[in-house]
Amino acid sequence: MATYTPMIQQYLDIKAQYPDAFLFFRLGDFYEMFFDDAIKAAQELEITLTSRDGGGEERVPMCGVPYHSAQGYIEQLISKGYKVAICEQVEDPKTAKGVVRREVVQLITPGTVMEGKGLLDKENNYLATVTMFDDGTYGFAYTDLSTGENRITLLASLDDVMNELYAIGTKEIVISSQFPEQYQQLLKERYDVTISYEDETVIPEGFTSIVEALQQDKLKITFGRLLHYIIRTQKRRLDHMQSVQVYQVDHYMKIDLYSKRNLELTETIRSKGRKGSLLWLLDETVTAMGGRLLKQWLDRPLLDRKQIERRLHMVETLIHHYFERQELRERLREVYDVERLAGRVAYGNVNARDLIQLKKSLQQIPALKDIVEKLPDHEAKQLANKLDPCSELVDLLERSIQENPPLSVKEGNIIKDGYNETLDRYRDASRNGKAWIAQLESKERELTGIKSLKIGYNRVFGYYIEVTKPNLHLLPKGRYERKQTLANAERFITQELKEKEALILEAEEKSIELEYELFVDIRERVKQYIPRLQSLAKTISELDVLQSFATVSEERHYVKPQFSDNRELIIQAGRHPVVEKVLGAQTYVPNDCYMNKERELLLITGPNMSGKSTYMRQIALTVIMAQIGCFVPAEKAVLPIFDQVFTRIGAADDLVSGQSTFMVEMLEARNAIVHATQNSLILFDEIGRGTSTYDGMALAQAIIEYIHDHIGAKTLFSTHYHELTDLEQSLAKLKNVHVRAVEENGKVVFLHKIEEGPADQSYGIHVAELAELPASLIQRAKEILAELEQQEQRKEQPSGKNEAVFEQLSMFAEEQPSKEESHLSKKEKKALEALKSVNLLETTPLEALNKLYEIQKLLK
């Protein structure tokens, strides 16, 4: 066994307690890392890997970063999912006997970040915990340490857990060490998160209010696990975590994770970014707090009609009061992130500049209150009453903190004159002492006759009298004590100067010490306001989101939705909000949608790329916007309250779990069929396309019949199986609609307009004509299509309610007999095969043109 130096052994002992974290080990002005940590950190941070003697036979790998710039390096590691343990020297090296005592003062993890670039203004940084109980239920809790927001619930299944995790976008999940391995693997695959472990579940002392709020043992166990993990990693008590909100998922519209992705509510499928999502469109918030709340509202649309209508009424009021809304926006822009400032106060890392930001924010509250109180709306009056100006706190900060304080809280110049008498005396002593020294310099020049004599100061020798060598003979004997000899001068001290120096330096030192003590006292007094600041932040956030809805609704000409009591859905001139913004209102084609108890299932047919998917998405987005309390993109909207939204739109394979497009289709279809109620909204786009024609049609028909007969949910079902349109004859509540397309002078024009009835034909061959494929090939394609249609009619008819023939709305039928192909030349066969292989559902317009160009080249 290797024998290491005491310092390296100390490192190893501490590292053993934090095996899954990088240990930032404080050595003087650096944080050092050793052994495997050093090798890995050097790679991840792109810093130099070196080595040092550790007492053993081989040198120890080592790398380090300066402590004053460590934050940036820590953020890099955290952003990559690592943990960092900060190990500080906890005793003065000058007085230490042997190795300086060191302790880990904080374990920073992806879910416990409190400051820095890792915290985005308009995004929460959630830490979640999942507890699995013997009866198959799950306790689920999450917190944002930077804001003090805590929420908890009980969930019935692992699917519900997955949906909640996706909704909050957590960075880290805390579980029991006994959590099943297969479920841990599932969490890691589905979400790129850090998994951490905590087995202690008893709520610690000091959290009485939380114990009282959590009546069920399951909730106490779940939140206890979360609290213990936070205390263990942060090594401190967090005063802003004294409340928890118990919520029920069935109080909100359920949107499963597949549907949230398909609808691009908070991020786009391709870029995984905000731009192009519904959140991006709706975000006209001007505070960080409002931006975060907007996403929370979008993740959890309401079911309570009264709550929805309260929001809508406030939005309507703000739309009708433009000047008040603009003034409200201007005032809100002056408000800093009060929620996170309160978190920093509780955490103990708030600085004087933070307190000035808090003061400036609170100074806006009276004006905000005045604006909101004047609005003719009951909800506005209630919000105004919640705008707490915290006048005593503003007064404290106004009296105590300098307007432009330094970033450091230990270098003085933080506290205002007049706040503390003792501090004022120290400052007077320091200022007067310096003035006395200036007078002494004049007096010494006069006494000695040396005009070049000067009094200076440095940290090594303190104050001194400097005389050039040619003038040394002019100094009176016995009065000056030599301190330092320079090349051209001598430096002296007098008893009088020595005594004054002691007074000045003592005053400055005591002044800085007292300032820090006063700052800590002020910080502790501010802590008492944390609950009020958190409540105020919540109200400001609500105001910001509501004005954001009003701003977007007015700019985009949205309409206030009404809610029906008979499950009727009427949307006149509805638009897809995001597509309309990108294309422009003049370009976008609006569409109607009408559904009621006799018209519950719309079967949508039409050519590919004609707008079926966009139409379906816009219905869902309209419903969601209405239930978060926003106006909607339509000329008129009367909607039922939907309890759930399910979608199957898009054909991206689940590459992570190795599931095919068809398997993903079936899983998403199952999710809707098992959980949907008659109050749900289902959007199915091209179900069944991932398998053979007959399998696909059979499944599509069976799903339609099941929804129609057993669920009764409002359903939009698009299909390329034209035969399914005959179901209108046998299913009373199914109606056909189609996307209109017309031929003009031999050209196909997609009008993107939804009309009653089924689509009457396919336009695949017309598209091939537009691409200028050889006339002989086009003619042959038409002949083959006609022959195939005749053959299909002779084949086995679909069973049950649908007596239609099998005919696909696609470029060509999928199955073509080899005897037909025998009439073609080799070139034509190759071109036809290439054309058949094009999957229009997964091909962009540009890719299609490139493919057609290749086919043309084959025939030349």
UniProtKB/Swiss-Prot annotation:
GO cellular component: cytosol
GO BP terms: mismatch repair
GO molecular function, one term: ATP binding
Database matches in Pfam families: MutS_I, MutS_II, MutS_III, MutS_IV, MutS_V
Keywords assigned by UniProt, alphabetized: ATP-binding, DNA damage, DNA repair, DNA-binding, Nucleotide-binding
Binding-site residues for ATP, renumbered to this chain: 606-613
Gene3D superfamilies on file: 1.10.1420.10, DNA repair protein MutS, domain I, MutS, connector domain, P-loop containing nucleotide triphosphate hydrolases
Role summary: This protein is involved in the repair of mismatches in DNA. It is possible that it carries out the mismatch recognition step. This protein has a weak ATPase activity.
Record family assignment: Belongs to the DNA mismatch repair MutS family.
NCBIfam families assigned: mutS1, PRK05399.1
Protein name: DNA mismatch repair protein MutS
Organism for this UniProt entry: Geobacillus sp. (strain WCH70)
